[in-house]
Regions:
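Short, acidic/polar
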Residues: 16-29, 51, 77-84, 147-158, ...
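Conserved, mostly hydrophobic/aromatic
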Residues: 9, 37, 87, 159, ...
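Active-site mouth loops of central-metabolism enzymes
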Residues: 5-21, 66-78, 133-151, 228-242
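Active-site beta-loop-alpha junctions enriched in small/polar residues
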Residues: 10-13, 40-44, 69-75, 100-101, ...
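Conserved beta-strand positions in the central sheet of alpha/beta enzyme cores
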Residues: 38, 96-97, 135, 168, ...
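Conserved N-terminal beta1-alpha1 strand-loop-helix module at the mouth
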Residues: 1-39
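Active-site-adjacent beta->alpha loops and helix N-cap segments on the catalytic face
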Residues: 17-19, 45-58, 76-82, 102-126, ...
Length: 289
């Protein structure tokens, strides 16, 4: 069984302690030689400056390719593309292009009058700008705004037709959910090898339930019961490691070539899952000196 490529998602820190945590997590996971790491972009572009700062910070690690997230919420086309140009000026050649979530309390997505109406328009504009590698979102468990599962596939195909290079899925808990999604994508003419499943190692069960409810990720009853039992017995971390490793292992057995991890700026569980999959970390020369 071949080893998959890896990528890791981080979020921009808010304070000096957060920057130290990000640095430590990125350094630990960069040692696994990921294809890239990405930095998220807050709702409504609320972390625009912090995202760029974090991307520059991560870009200082040797050999690390960084992707900046970019959304079209609450900004004009000119403002959005100025962020893309800032990424390029900082040496970034990868962008995760998303519609984005509206600011809290706004309700549904409302395009800016002078902004991009959706992610497809954003992708096309980025492709026209220059030599960006564009990653997009995909949703094995139906996107909350999608009419049905077929609509998700239609929308994903439009993203690839607009110029996307790869898709990173929302996290999920049942590998069969991903395989069914992959099969539907392939049937629609999408190259399924360009879809990387997203894995969220569970660091906090209560928070993950909230995340799942917000993004529409289905929670299999047996997984929920397992976490609840493990929490009562004080074995939540061990169960989380076993659950994420089993999920990743099944995906790789099923032919997946790239795994995308949502790290929440903590290396521990993600690092241990990678090790359990047989990945070897390579020490940095500076760490050995």
């Amino acid at each position: 069984m071949s080893r998959p490529g890896l990528s890791f998602e981080f979020f921009p820190p808010r304070d000096p302690a957060g920057r130290e945590r990000l640095d430590a997590a990125a350094r630990a996971l960069a040692a696994f030689g990921p294809r890239f790491v990405s930095v998220t972009y807050g709702a409504g572009g609320s972390t625009r400056t912090a995202t760029l700062d974090a991307a520059r910070r991560l870009g200082r690690l040797p050999g690390l390719r960084v992707a900046g997230h970019l959304t079209c919420v609450g900004a004009t086309r000119a403002e959005t593309l100025s962020v893309a140009r800032a990424y390029a000026a900082a040496g970034l050649r990868d962008i995760v292009a998303l519609r984005g979530d509206p600011p809290r309390g706004q309700g549904g997505f409302v395009p800016h009058p002078d902004g991009f109406r959706d992610s497809v328009e954003l992708i096309a504009a980025l492709k026209a700008m220059g030599d960006f590698r564009i990653h997009v979102g995909a949703y094995p468990d139906r996107h909350p705004d999608a009419a049905d599962a077929d609509a998700d596939i239609v929308w994903l195909k439009r993203k690839f037709e607009a110029g996307a290079d790869s898709a990173l899925t929302q996290f999920f808990f049942d590998p069969e959910t991903f395989f069914r999604f992959r099969d539907r994508a392939a049937a629609a003419g999408i190259d399924a090898d360009r879809i990387a499943p997203g894995i969220l190692p569970v660091q906090n069960w209560t928070k993950v339930q909230q995340f799942a409810a917000g993004c529409g990720a289905a929670m299999p009853p047996q997984i929920a019961q397992g976490f609840e039992n493990a929490a009562r017995q004080g074995n939540e971390r061990l169960y989380a490691l076993a659950q994420a490793t089993q999920l990743a292992d099944r995906l790789v057995e099923g032919g997946v070539r790239h795994l995308h991890f949502y790290t929440l700026n903590s290396a521990g569980l993600t690092r241990d899952v990678c090790r359990a999959l047989g990945m070897r970390a390579r020490p940095f020369l500076a760490d050995a000196a």
